[in-house]
C-alpha cells in the first residue's frame, strides 16, 4: 500500500493513507466516519467540541539556538524545550499507528517566487477537507513532483497530559521552526491549522524581504490594489467585498516588491447572524465542498440557524475562493498597494470615522493595533474595553513587532501609498457608524476623491481629518460635533489617549519619532 513517504516523518504502520482526495471523496469519508452531517445546502457541518476558537495559551515554539534570537518571547510566543516537543511528537505518531490518515499536499503563497509547500497530515477527513479548501491547491503536475518545505500533523483526538507532557492543557499547538514542523493535538478547531501556516509565513517571509500581513486585499478596475488591516469584527471581510473591485483574499497576504499576494486559496468566514441580505457572497458560499463549524442545524430539515450561538459565537465556514463571484483567482495584484486602510471599532466615540496618517503615525497605529470590545450587558458592564493586538495580528507574529512596523513603513514609502485610519465604531450619538457611510469613506480613499477635501488636525490624535466626503453628513466627520456634552467628549479623548500611551510603553524597540506620533496625553 502506498504511504506517500510518511515513514520519513516516522509515521509507520498507519491504516489506510489517502492523499489529496477531492472534496466529494473527503465528504464521503467524513460522513462514513461520523465526523459530521450534511446540511440542506450540501455543506458539511461539524461540531468541534469544547474548542470553538483558537487556543492561544496552548501554543508553544520550540526554543533552539538556531531560532532563539529571532523570536519575540513572551506571553504570545512561549518557549518549549526540544526534548518535550520530540516526546509529544513521538506519542502523536504512535497514536496514529493503525489509524487512517489523510494527507493534503499544497501551497501557501500565490506568488511563485515566495510559495512554500506544505504537507498537512490529518487524523480527520473533515479537517483535511478544510485545509484542501483553504490552502492553494496543486495541479496534477505539481503533485507528481511535490517536495514539502513544512509539515503540519493534526491529531485532534490525541490528548496531552499536562503533568507528563509539560503542556498547559490537553490541547497543544507546537511549532518547531528549525525542524519545519508543527504538531497540533487535543483541539478540533480547524482554524489552528490555517493559523499555523500563517505563523510559519510570518517567520520566513521577512527574511526574503516580503511583508506578511493579517489583512484583506482587493483590486480596482485599473489594477490598483488596497489592503485592509483590522482585528476581528472591524469589517475586513465586509469592506473588502466590494462589487466594484476584485477580491484577492480575506485574511492573509504578503507585500512583495511588485505585488500583493494571497497566502491562501480559500476563506474562513464568521457565520454568526449571517444573512443573504447582509453578506450574500458568504451566504451563497455555504454549499457542497464547504466545511461549516459549530452552526446549529435542524436535525430534520438540515437548515442552518445562523442566529443561534448555542454551539459557538465564533461559528465559521471554510470554502475555496472560487465560491466568491468576483474573486481574483490568481491570488495576486499586478502592482503594490496605493491605499492602506487600518480598521478600528472605537467604542469611546472619539476617533474620527476616517483620517489620514503620516509615516510615523502609520507605524504607531499599526504597532498599537487598537480596537475596542463592548462588554456584555449580562454582567452589567457598560464601559468599553480597549483592546490592543500588535500589528493587528499579535497571536501570529513570531518576530519582534518593530520588524513588521519597519517593513510597513518601507513598503508604504516605496509605493507612495496613502494610509488611512477608518473607525467603523461609534460616535457621540451612541450609535455605530452606518455601513453605507463607512463604504462611502473607503471608496473616497480608494478613488483618491478624499484628497480634494480640506483637512483639519485632530487636537488629541494628531491625525488629518477631512471636512467633506460625498455621501457622508459633514457633522459626522469631526467627532466633537457628534457630542452634545463637550466635557464628556474631552474626558473620553483623554481616557483613550492614555490607554494608547500606556500600551505603547512595551514597545522598547520603536524609535522616539514613532513614539511621539501617538495621541497627545
Say what each PLM segment does.
Residues 155-204:
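Charged, amphipathic alpha-helical linker segments immediately N-terminal to NTP-binding catalytic cores
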Residues 236:
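Conserved lysine of the Walker
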Residues 1-144:
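N-terminal accessory targeting/assembly segments
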Residues 68-73, 176-181, 385-391:
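Gly-rich Lys/Arg/Thr-decorated short loops/hinges at beta-loop-alpha junctions or inter-strand turns
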Amino acid at each position: 500500500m502506498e504511504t506517500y513517504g510518511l515513514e520519513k516523518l516516522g509515521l509507520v504502520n498507519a491504516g489506510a493513507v489517502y492523499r489529496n482526495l477531492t472534496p466529494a471523496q473527503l465528504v464521503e469519508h467524513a460522513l462514513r466516519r461520523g465526523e459530521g452531517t450534511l446540511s440542506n445546502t450540501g455543506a458539511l457541518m461539524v461540531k468541534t467540541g469544547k474548542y470553538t476558537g483558537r487556543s492561544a495559551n496552548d501554543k508553544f515554539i520550540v526554543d533552539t539556538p538556531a531560532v532563539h534570537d529571532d523570536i519575540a518571547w513572551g506571553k504570545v510566543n512561549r518557549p518549549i524545550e526540544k526534548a518535550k516537543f520530540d516526546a509529544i511528537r513521538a506519542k502523536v505518531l504512535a497514536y496514529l499507528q493503525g489509524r487512517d490518515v489523510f494527507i493534503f499536499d499544497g501551497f501557501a503563497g500565490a506568488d511563485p517566487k515566495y510559495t512554500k509547500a506544505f504537507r498537512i497530515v490529518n487524523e480527520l477527513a473533515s479537517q483535511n477537507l478544510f485545509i484542501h479548501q483553504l490552502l492553494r491547491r496543486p495541479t496534477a503536475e505539481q503533485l507528481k513532483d511535490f517536495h514539502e518545505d513544512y509539515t503540519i500533523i493534526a491529531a485532534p483526538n490525541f490528548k496531552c497530559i499536562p503533568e507528563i507532557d509539560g503542556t498547559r492543557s490537553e490541547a497543544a499547538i507546537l511549532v518547531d521552526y528549525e525542524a519545519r514542523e508543527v504538531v497540533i493535538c487535543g483541539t478540533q478547531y480547524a482554524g489552528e491549522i490555517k493559523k499555523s501556516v500563517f505563523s510559519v509565513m510570518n517567520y520566513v517571509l521577512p527574511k526574503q524581504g516580503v511583508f506578511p500581513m493579517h489583512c484583506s486585499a482587493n483590486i480596482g478596475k485599473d489594477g490598483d490594489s488596497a489592503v485592509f488591516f483590522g482585528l476581528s469584527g472591524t469589517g475586513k471581510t465586509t469592506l473588502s467585498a466590494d462589487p466594484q473591485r476584485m477580491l484577492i483574499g480575506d485574511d492573509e497576504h504578503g507585500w512583495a516588491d511588485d505585488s500583493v499576494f494571497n497566502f491562501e486559496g480559500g476563506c474562513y468566514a464568521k457565520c454568526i447572524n449571517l444573512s443573504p441580505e447582509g453578506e450574500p457572497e458568504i451566504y451563497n458560499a455555504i454549499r457542497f465542498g464547504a466545511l461549516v463549524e459549530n452552526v446549529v442545524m435542524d436535525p430534520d430539515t438540515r437548515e442552518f440557524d445562523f442566529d443561534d450561538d448555542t454551539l459557538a459565537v465564533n461559528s465559521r465556514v471554510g470554502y475555496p475562493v472560487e465560491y466568491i463571484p468576483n474573486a481574483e483567482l490568481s491570488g495576486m495584484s499586478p502592482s503594490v498597494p496605493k491605499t492602506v486602510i487600518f480598521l478600528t471599532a472605537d467604542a469611546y466615540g472619539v476617533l474620527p470615522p476616517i483620517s489620514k496618517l503620516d509615516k510615523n503615525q502609520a507605524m504607531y497605529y499599526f504597532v498599537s493595533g487598537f480596537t475596542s470590545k463592548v462588554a456584555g450587558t449580562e454582567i452589567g458592564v457598560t464601559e468599553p474595553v480597549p483592546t490592543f493586538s500588535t500589528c493587528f495580528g499579535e497571536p501570529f507574529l513570531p518576530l519582534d513587532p518593530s520588524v513588521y512596523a519597519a517593513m510597513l513603513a518601507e513598503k508604504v514609502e516605496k509605493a507612495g501609498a496613502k494610509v488611512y485610519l477608518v473607525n467603523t465604531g461609534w460616535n457621540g450619538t451612541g450609535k455605530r457608524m452606518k455601513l453605507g457611510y463607512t463604504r462611502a469613506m473607503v471608496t473616497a480613499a480608494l478613488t483618491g476623491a478624499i484628497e480634494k477635501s480640506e483637512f483639519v488636525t485632530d487636537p488629541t490624535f494628531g491625525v488629518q481629518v477631512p471636512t467633506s466626503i460625498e455621501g457622508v453628513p459633514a457633522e459626522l466627520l469631526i467627532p466633537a460635533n457628534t457630542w452634545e456634552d463637550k466635557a464628556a467628549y474631552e474626558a473620553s479623548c483623554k481616557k483613550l489617549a492614555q490607554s494608547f500611551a500606556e500600551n505603547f510603553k512595551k514597545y522598547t524597540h520603536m524609535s522616539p519619532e514613532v513614539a511621539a506620533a501617538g495621541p497627545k496625553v
